[in-house]
């Protein structure tokens, strides 16, 4: 089952430039691997300008009750030396450069990026927010994003370290004419609905000033996905 949901969002700032990030969008797909039933959630920044360019995202955080558990439980199947392509919730990395095979690993791996393909040439990097703050099992440390969980400090972010390569621009393959991928989250099929907030920095790709957008996106439980579909609140993905 695959569906697309439009996240509730609030525009944090605008300018005279034509670039507008209108919302976070989520594509959900049921998959199975290594005996595990999972839901793959792909999160995209959706724009309305022909050259809109995503630069970075930050202030990632869970919203609502039970959120302490929402920083963990992600599946990884990356090709890092501490994971080796084994599906795991204990070991993994969020670095897109280490995702591995486009068929054997990528469809079942959690990773973060600013557009482009999750491959060795991707120029997305973790910002310093991964190195400190947070509490309990999800505290930040010097390992950065080389971990299976997420830091719960409310400032978590990542960025394109080489903006001139236009990796974060709409229409630059594999980005579509309106969307730039910012992450893929793999969760067990029985998980509870999770809501996250995220802020983006972007411009119109043509010399415009940097603008900022803050909004929420939802990773719904499988039952919620089905109910939304019956209510006509989801649509089939064209991706």
What are these regions (language model features)?
Residues 220-238:
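A short, hydrophobic C-terminal helix/tail in secreted or cell-surface proteins
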Residues 121-176:
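Short helix-loop boundary/capping segments
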Residues 1-4, 235-239:
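Positively charged n-region of N-terminal signal peptides that target proteins for export
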Residues 29-144:
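Low-complexity, serine/threonine/proline/glycine-rich extracellular segments that form mucin-like
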